Amino acid sequence: HWIGGWIWYYIQKANRENFLYDLYDIDGGNIQYTHYYPGDYYTWHIDGDISTTFKPEIKPGTGENLRDDQTFHKGECVRKLSFSLQLSDAKDYRGGEVEFINSAGERYFAPKQKGTLIVFDSRTKHRVRTVKSGLRKSLVGWVVGPRWR
C-alpha cells in the first residue's frame, strides 16, 4: 500500500538525520490502526530493548512476506524505531497526548496535528494519556534491524 511506502520514506529520513541505526524494514510489514475512545489510554511502556530478538516475517527492504527458507532472513532482529502517524485532527478530541519521558525524568509531548509522523527510539519510555472526549486515531508500527553492536 502507498501509505507504507510513504511512512518508510520518512522513517529512513528520520533515521539518517537522527539515529543512523542499521534497519531492515517495518516489523512484519505490519502497521496497526489504533483508536482511543473517551477513557482509553496506554500506560507507560517501551517497545523494545537490547534483548528483544525474533525472526522477521518479511524480506528485508521489500516488505514482502517470506514463504521459502532460501530467502528467509536467518539473523535475529530487534525493534529499533517506533512510529505513530496522527490520523485525527487535534480539535476532534481532548486528552490522548503521546508523552515521552527521558532518563533524567524530563517529559515531552508529541504534536497532535493531523498528519504528523512521530519516529522515536523504541527504547524510549512513552504512553498515551487518557482521552477525555472525542476519538483519537493513529497508525503505529515498529522498525526492526540487526542486533545492537
Question: What residues fall within each predicted segment?
Answer:
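Fe(II)/2-oxoglutarate oxygenase catalytic core
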Residues: 1-117, 123-149
